[in-house]
Amino acid sequence: MVRRRVLLATFPAQGHINPALQFAKRLLKAGTDVTFFTSVYAWRRMANTASAAAGNPPGLDFVAFSDGYDDGLKPCGDGKRYMSEMKARGSEALRNLLLNNHDVTFVVYSHLFAWAAEVARESQVPSALLWVEPATVLCIYYFYFNGYADEIDAGSDEIQLPRLPPLEQRSLPTFLLPETPERFRLMMKEKLETLDGEEKAKVLVNTFDALEPDALTAIDRYELIGIGPLIPSAFLDGGDPSETSYGGDLFEKSEENNCVEWLDTKPKSSVVYVSFGSVLRFPKAQMEEIGKGLLACGRPFLWMIREQKNDDGEEEEEELSCIGELKKMGKIVSWCSQLEVLAHPALGCFVTHCGWNSAVESLSCGVPVVAVPQWFDQTTNAKLIEDAWGTGVRVRMNEGGGVDGSEIERCVEMVMDGGEKSKLVRENAIKWKTLAREAMGEDGSSLKNLNAFLHQVARA
């Protein structure tokens, strides 16, 4: 029997690579081979980190193309030119690959690689979008460009869109806020126009039916398919206890003392974990406020602070003024295995930027959240966490758009102090952890949805 082969065209950022690799592993388990298509920069970083030491599983191969930025985009680089070069060079590479490799029967692409769908269409290869944000966010974008722009732009405190809960302006994706440059809205419009080029576009979403039942059915024009949570099996259904990482880290985890060993010394549900993802960089003044808030809580904490380097690769961050006190009370690392941390019994709460991967991971591990959203989908994710699922609280920004240390303290205590709100948040966190695992279980909705999708791939 000839095995099917799906090509995964994946944007070279950790937030896209992690769910794409996990999706690839699920395809492999179902008997479908995978070609992982990404940039040279991402491929090199993935190949050089410890997570890649075990090698590729059978049926998975990597194809890397040069986007002109093989050493990555510098912190002060031209993002617009970067995306333009990515599209031009990536399209050419994918076109040649599909022309010369007739084994590929289906293309699945990241939304920042929407051009991959256009190339697939030219090559008469069917495609689907792998959406790595909540279905709710895709619905908001869709309705904005399909009749609801005036209502959303009006800045009302109660924006009502079809089949979605009421939204206020601060909970919209930041691409739709008045202060965001128009080119970002146009970029998202182009992504949706790519989907509109299909008769009934398929969108694979890193969510599950019970989590977003209304959003998954809100757009008649598209077929939204919940296939998540896309996280390693050891932290979800337990089908493969050895699968403890995504397998494609762009950054090495900290070698200075083992985070898990440190957590082993702490009481159950006592530690505050603080991480703002692989991209976000706060100014020093904001970092000082976060530090003050953690010290005021008086609880042990694990704080992941990425090393910040300038265009010449030199470290440029200054030490926090309270670094000595912070190191006495908690542990600061430059990188760690987030899932191992979230799954540890000592974890009591997660202070996060609310990137969707982090949101899904905390939900799947049953960890309450303090939401500190900054941009993109994070603001909507925070709304869902606080109001729809009840698994956390969202910080209140000060007049300057930052977060005071006292607000960090207030929110951490709200989910950690054992009071009525704390108990409710923890009960909800456990409930959604159970539902997430059920979704990927043997009779779960996501597994059924994935199998139905693969049946369609087989007929392609």
UniProtKB/Swiss-Prot annotation:
Enzyme class: transferase
Residues reported in the UniProt entry to bind an anthocyanidin: H16
Role played: Catalyzes the glucosylation at the O-5 position of anthocyanidin 3-glucosides to form anthocyanidin 3,5-di-O-glucosides using UDP-glucose as sugar donor. Anthocyanidin 3,5-di-O-glucosides are molecules that are responsible for pigmentation. Also acts on anthocyanidin 3-O-(6-O-malonylglucoside). Much less active with hydroxycinnamoylglucose derivatives. No activity in the absence of the 3-O-glucoside group.
Catalytic activity: an anthocyanidin 3-O-beta-D-glucoside + UDP-alpha-D-glucose = an anthocyanidin 3,5-di-O-beta-D-glucoside + UDP + 2 H(+)
The entry's keywords: Glycosyltransferase, Signal, Transferase
Signal peptide location: 1-22
Biological processes per GO annotation: anthocyanin-containing compound biosynthetic process; pigmentation
EC number: 2.4.1.298
Top-level taxon in the UniProt lineage: Eukaryota
GO molecular function: hexosyltransferase activity; quercetin 3-O-glucosyltransferase activity; quercetin 7-O-glucosyltransferase activity; UDP-D-glucose:delphinidin 3-O-glucosyl-5-O-caffeoylglucoside -O-beta-D-glucosyltransferase activity
Similarity section: Belongs to the UDP-glycosyltransferase family.
Annotated UDP-alpha-D-glucose binding sites: Q338, H353, W356, N357, S358, E361, D377, Q378
Organism: Perilla frutescens (Beefsteak mint)
CDD domains: GT1_Gtf-like
Active site: H16 (proton acceptor)
Pathway where it operates: Pigment biosynthesis; anthocyanin biosynthesis
Record bears the keyword Signal: yes
Name of this protein: Anthocyanidin 3-O-glucoside 5-O-glucosyltransferase 1
pH dependence statement: Optimum pH is 8.0-8.5.
Alphabetical list of InterPro entries matching this protein: UDP_glucos_trans (IPR002213), UDP_glycos_trans_CS (IPR035595)
